Each structure stands twice: as C-alpha cells, then as structure tokens.
C-alpha cells in the first residue's frame, strides 16, 4: 500500500515536473516573441491566458493574437449596432453609430484575412491586412469628430485603444516572422 | 518639358499611378530637415508624422494632395495597389495641407516587404470639393487616376516620390 502510494507520488511529481519544463520552454518563446512588440506585458498576458499558447510557434502566437483582435472588433461592432444605436433617439448619432459598427465589422474581416495570410505564410499581405484592421477604428473616431458638438464616447475610445494595441502586437510579431 | 518628369517616368510613377503630365506648380516636401527629391530614400521612423508640404499658387486656387503607395504589399506582388496614405482637399494655393480639409488622415509608411515608392501628387481643383468627398471605404486598392477623374481634378500639377523600406530591427525599438 505504502509503496504504491510512493510510486503514485513519484509519477505525479515526475509528470508535473516535465509539464513545468515544457511549459517553461514555451514561456520563453512567448517572452522572446513579445519582446519584439511595443506592448510586452500586454502581449505576454494575452498569450499566456490562451490554452493553445504553450504548444504554439511564433506563427501560431500571431494567429492567437489575431483571434483576440477579431473578438474585440466583433464585440465592438455588436455593441455599437445592437446595444447603443438601438437605444438612441438622435438620428445623427444613430447613423454615426451604425457606420462605426460597420467599420469594426470590416476590421474583423481584415483580421480574418490575416489568419488566411498566416496560413499561407504570406506575411506581407498579413502586415497590410493588420494595418487596415488598425485603421478602421480611426475612421469611426473621425466620423464622430466631423459632427459638431458630438462627443466621442469613452467606451468606444477604450475599445479603439484596445484594438490598436492588439494590432500593434500582431504587427510586431509579423515583423519578426518576416525577418 | 519631358526632362522635368524623367525621374517619374524612370521610376514608373508615370505608368503605374499617373499619366504623363506637365508640372505647372511647385511643391516642396520635407520630413524634418530632409528635403524630398524624386527617388530619395526615407526611413519610415522619420516619416511617422505627416511631412511639411508647401505649394505654390494663388490663394484663390484650391489644391488636392494625395499620398499613395503602388507597391503594397510588396513591389513584386502589388496586389493591393494602391494603398492610399493621405488625402487633403481644398488646400488654398501658396499654403500647406494644414489649411485644407483632411479627407483621409495621414498614415505613415510601413512597408512590410521590399522597397516601396511613396508618391505625393498635387492636383489643382476646379471648384471646392470638401463636402462632396467621402473617406474611401478602404485604403487598399485605391486608384489615384479614378479619384482624380471622379472629382474632375484633371492631370497632376506637381508630383514627387520617395522610396522607403523596413528598417533593421535594431533601429526600430
């Protein structure tokens, strides 16, 4: 009984030790990949919280990050179309919100194309598609700016900054892949 | 006349983006202290902010400035030609783009692969354009020729282009 317990303990310890070792070596890939971006801490925390990252290579990490961006862009498009523009009575603001929602949908589409580019290892295309995704939220902000007296909502500003940061990380990782 | 547009022909700016034209205006472009002459090399890190552009002409004339990259995403496979970086309209003659209406905000050159040409094209407008021009839906697959045709801008009155490529990693951080 005691020996089998000891045996079980040894097996458990060995298993967790080897998991720790392989997890640690891939943590190094995540860290070195994120070092090439301008948002190291954000990059590391976003990647580490994804279950696929321990076994991903640099290209895989880029894809994970693009996925994070797609989630952000799609949820922002939904937020703008569904929640916000439906509750607004001002016709001008409603139109701006609907147009903005469209832009964030286009950003998500661009990021979807980026995943395809990554699959095809067409990193130059991927770079341009990420640039486009990063640019669409600017268009939304400018639409607010063009209307006199219309304030740019804080929540949209926060989401815009978030998407820009995510795209910045992807661009950084792509730079490394192209080299 | 041909001699003054030769670099643009040699650089295939005329052909890939523009049709043959006779320059009738002056445009000076500076990134910081660096004066842009056709085909000069610019580091993307020095072009993060829009260049200083001064144009000739009378204050009652209005001009449009377009900055475009025909070599996106790479010069060997420019399937996204052109990638438009900046559009400013209704610039009064003798002034600069800050006095015009920025239709599309400046986006810095970020050439992912290869050496890209970045072309600044100046048009003289026949009438104010500001309210009619919408931001293009996407920066990719822009056509300067079609844009000029759509807003009746005619042929360019001045053009200058520079080259840029990605800087080595050690410089960018």
Curated annotation (Swiss-Prot), chain B:
<dbReference type="InterPro" id="IPR035810">
    <property type="entry name" value="PEBP_euk"/>
</dbReference>
<keyword id="KW-0007">Acetylation</keyword>
<dbReference type="GO" id="GO:0005634">
    <property type="term" value="C:nucleus"/>
</dbReference>
<dbReference type="InterPro" id="IPR008914">
    <property type="entry name" value="PEBP"/>
</dbReference>
<dbReference type="InterPro" id="IPR001858">
    <property type="entry name" value="Phosphatidylethanolamine-bd_CS"/>
</dbReference>
<dbReference type="Pfam" id="PF01161">
    <property type="entry name" value="PBP"/>
</dbReference>
<comment type="similarity">
    <text>Belongs to the phosphatidylethanolamine-binding protein family.</text>
</comment>
<dbReference type="InterPro" id="IPR036610">
    <property type="entry name" value="PEBP-like_sf"/>
</dbReference>
<keyword id="KW-0938">Abscisic acid signaling pathway</keyword>
<protein>
    <recommendedName>
        <fullName>Protein MOTHER of FT and TFL1</fullName>
    </recommendedName>
</protein>
<feature type="modified residue" description="N-acetylalanine">
    <location>
        <position position="2"/>
    </location>
</feature>
<dbReference type="GO" id="GO:0010030">
    <property type="term" value="P:positive regulation of seed germination"/>
</dbReference>
<comment type="function">
    <text>May form complexes with phosphorylated ligands by interfering with kinases and their effectors. Regulates seed germination via the abscisic acid (ABA) and gibberellic acid (GA)signaling pathways. During seed germination, MFT expression is directly repressed by ABI3 or promoted by ABI5 in the ABA signaling pathway. Involved in a negative feedback regulation of ABA signaling. Promotes embryo growth by direct repression of ABI5. In the GA signaling pathway, MFT expression is promoted by the DELLA protein RGL2 during seed germination.</text>
</comment>
<dbReference type="GO" id="GO:0009737">
    <property type="term" value="P:response to abscisic acid"/>
</dbReference>
<dbReference type="GO" id="GO:0009738">
    <property type="term" value="P:abscisic acid-activated signaling pathway"/>
</dbReference>
<dbReference type="GO" id="GO:0005737">
    <property type="term" value="C:cytoplasm"/>
</dbReference>
<keyword id="KW-0963">Cytoplasm</keyword>
């Amino acid at each position: 009984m005691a020996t089998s317990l000891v045996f079980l303990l040894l097996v458990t310890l060995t298993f967790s030790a080897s998991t720790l070792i392989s997890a640690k070596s891939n943590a190094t890939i995540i860290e070195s990949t994120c070092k090439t971006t301008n948002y190291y801490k954000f990059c590391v925390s976003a990647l580490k919280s994804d279950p696929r990252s321990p076994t991903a290579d640099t290209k895989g990490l880029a894809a994970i990050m693009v996925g994070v961006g797609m989630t952000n862009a799609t949820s922002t498009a939904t937020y703008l179309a569904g929640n916000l523009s439906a509750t607004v009575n001002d016709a001008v603001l409603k139109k701006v919100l609907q147009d903005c929602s469209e832009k964030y949908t286009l950003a998500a589409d661009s990021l979807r194309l980026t995943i395809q580019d990554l699959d095809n290892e067409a990193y130059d295309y991927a770079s341009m598609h990420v640039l486009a995704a990063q640019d669409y939220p600017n268009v939304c902000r400018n639409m607010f700016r063009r209307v006199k007296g219309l304030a740019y909502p804080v929540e949209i500003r926060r989401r815009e900054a978030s998407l820009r940061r995510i795209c910045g990380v992807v661009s950084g990782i792509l730079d490394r892949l192209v080299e | 006349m041909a001699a003054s547009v030769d670099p643009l022909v040699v650089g295939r700016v005329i052909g890939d983006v523009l049709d043959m034209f006779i320059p009738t205006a002056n445009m000076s472009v500076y990134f910081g202290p660096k004066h842009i002459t056709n085909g000069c090399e610019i580091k993307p890190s020095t072009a993060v902010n829009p260049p200083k552009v001064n144009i000739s002409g009378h204050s009652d004339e209005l001009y449009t400035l377009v900055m475009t990259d025909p070599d996106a995403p790479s010069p060997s496979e420019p399937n996204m030609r052109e990638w438009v970086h900046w559009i400013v309209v209704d610039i009064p003659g003798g002034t600069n783009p800050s006095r015009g209406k920025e239709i599309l905000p400046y986006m810095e050159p970020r050439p992912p692969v290869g050496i890209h040409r970045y072309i600044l094209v100046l048009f003289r407008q026949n009438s104010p354009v500001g309210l009619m021009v919408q931001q293009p839906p996407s920066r990719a697959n822009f056509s300067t020729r079609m844009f000029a045709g759509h807003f009746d801008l005619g042929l360019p009155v001045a053009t200058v282009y520079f080259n840029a490529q990605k800087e080595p990693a050690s410089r960018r951080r």
